[in-house]
Amino acid sequence: MARAVGIDLGTTNSVVSVLEGGEPTVIANAEGARTTPSVVAFTKDGEVLVGETAKRQNVTNVDRTISSVKRHMGTDWTVGIDDKKYTSQELSARILGKLKRDAEQYLGDSVTDAVITVPAYFNDAERQATKEAGEIAGLNVLRIINEPTAAALAYGLDRGKEDELILVFDLGGGTFDVSLLEVGKDDDFSTIQVRSTAGDNRLGGDDWDQRIVDHLVKRFKESTGVDVSNDKIAKQRLKEAAEQAKKELSSSTSTSIQLPYLSLTENGPANLDETLTRAKFEELTNDLLERTRKPFEDVIREAGVSVGDVAHVVLVGGSTRMPAVVDLVKKLTGGKEPNKGVNPDEVVAVGAALQAGVLKGERKDVLLIDVTPLSLGIETKGGIMTKLIERNTAIPTKRSETFTTADDNQPSVAIQVFQGEREFTRDNKNLGTFELTGIAPAPRGIPQVEVTFDIDANGIVHVSAKDKGTGKEQSMTITGGSSLGKEDIERMVREAEEHAAEDKTRREQAEVRNNAEQLAYSIDKLIKENDDKLPEDVKSEVQGDVDGLKSALAGDDEDAVKTAFDKLSASQTKLGEAIYAQGQQEQAAGETPEGASEAKKDDEDIVDAEVVDEDDEDKKTDR
């Protein structure tokens, strides 16, 4: 039976998890690690590498190695490799495809369904692009859920029997979210409802790394006079060193960064040898840390609670291991110690697997209620953003509002859909436009156009407009900035499946050949063993088909092998019929008078017995 998995598609690393016996298990990849780098590399000989093997290409193959793709989801960003442009969806699909294969190898079963997580603050275009990436990878995306929600799902189910507020502080490689969730507990059922969420999709661990890189570039120029800011290979080496330094500074107060032969000068190779203290690192990145403060405060304010009402604080994402982040969270929550019982790299995937289990009926003890992170509305006269659905509204949801025309005899209205919190549409994200035509001529203000927003459980928006006078209706599903039509997705799915299809064809051809060789051998043997029992015409016909199949097997024409195989499969039944008929004739010939005499002689030794009641004094036995 095909299995469903939960996938955390991260900026830096990705994780896949599955329910086994109702409990989540993180699946190790083919390399034995529980996290897979979200990196794709194209080698010069045409091979596509994903994960750790791709990450190792970062320095030697810098122009053909792509990382942090998640930051480009929902945009028209592309990268060119060998005269072919790849979208963020296609590259993300490569990562998802590896996770899918690794899960299938671990489970020994096919994986078709998945719940994929996204940052809570992802807009509609970014969510749609994530769903498309899953489809390209050959996955049926059961649900797109928010990362903090998934983390709370994984964390909250095992915590006591009381109703509690859980605050999730999620700082990943490329995105940042804060969510406040309420976990309601009954005896055997839990309801997890998102109360509010806020974040910054352009803030993550990559930005902390970049500050170290900028610092090292500056120090290297000061000490050697060489500016490596435009040297791609040097910058990549610095980036890897910066990431490692950041990790080391989480447990040490200083770290040494040594990069020999980083560049060349007139006097020979120039080496980098720097010591970075935690204090200096925190000074370099203090403004980044401060950017996490406002979303935290917004979430508390919009939920209408005080910090003291929060029962648990959960840190999610590898970047929350930085001591400065932990200290800030403690300060913001009034000294509350963040929970240390969850793995920040894995908890989101675990929650996604639990949600997959809920959707597939494997877990029936939890209900998840998420929210839309940004307000949705349309543009009305003057470029005003008229909101139909406010941010932090529970989803799925549906809202309608009636609008009218701005001019006399206006024959149509353009419905421009926006997402965001600003008062004017020009400052918000344009999700798309469609036109409702055929409005009956009438003075301005008379026609009534009902606009309906419908947000599904994935957070994806559907919009419709209906003229109440004529009954005419127009609708659209927002695809935002992903720029992928149905044909594009189908083409990418075909390309992603191309190699798998080739392998499948080769395997099927090999199976046909194996079956054909086995059939030819077994029929050949059957004919030889029953040579005297087979009529010449049957034997000649079937032997001819055997020889024909052997001849086809000697060649490379797979269609000829299949045709010859089918022909012999049909004609071989005549052998069975002939052998069975011969056996019946021999049996009939064997019923001779001598045989009857022998039967009579044998019968003399048979006792005929009549069974009667034991109490019957007249019981008798005839011999």
Swiss-Prot record:
Family matches, as InterPro entries: ATPase_NBD, Chaperone_DnaK, Heat_shock_70_CS, HSP70_C_sf, HSP70_peptide-bd_sf, Hsp_70_fam
Acidic residues bias (residue ranges): 604-617
PROSITE patterns per record: HSP70_1, HSP70_2, HSP70_3
Keyword Phosphoprotein: yes
Protein induction: By stress conditions e.g. heat shock.
Known role: Acts as a chaperone.
Protein name: Chaperone protein DnaK
Lineage of source species: Bacteria, Bacillati, Actinomycetota, Actinomycetes, Micrococcales
